[in-house]
């Protein structure tokens, strides 16, 4: 991705201080999504990552990973699979629990959506601690598919997600490092 494309994306991400709690600066991507040029640049860049790494399907993580992953899959000519919070998918699912700062959470996928022939690219808006991404990759592997990698719009490097994920991940690409 060119420097001009990165500048465009950065210019459309709004910092919201003290949200969702005091001391946190939330990275709001809604201005980027509202700008068709910026959203197209983002979609194209993530689709190129999928193609370059030989992905056959795209997984989007609830919730903003859905917003990014579905158009990326269409642009790359790939299928899209949502990974959702527990209890949100009907029918048979595989689930994976993971630790949060205070407690645990669980995500699910439809087992029949993954096959041994699949190379799955996980798409999300941000890489922070890597907990959700690690759980998603474990879930994909348990479903019998291969993980092609993780691609995100932005990485919050100070939270250590890359160090947590790199030992078990073939590819980890962040379009923006913040």
UniProtKB/Swiss-Prot annotation:
It is found in: Cytoplasm. Its main location: cytoplasm. One of its GO terms (biological process) is purine ribonucleoside salvage. Pathway: Purine metabolism; AMP biosynthesis via salvage pathway; AMP from adenine: step 1/1. It comes from the Bacteria. Its EC number is 2.4.2.7. Transmembrane segments: none annotated. Belongs to the purine/pyrimidine phosphoribosyltransferase family. Catalyzes a salvage reaction resulting in the formation of AMP, that is energically less costly than de novo synthesis. NCBIfam families: apt, PRK02304.1-3, PRK02304.1-5. This is Adenine phosphoribosyltransferase.
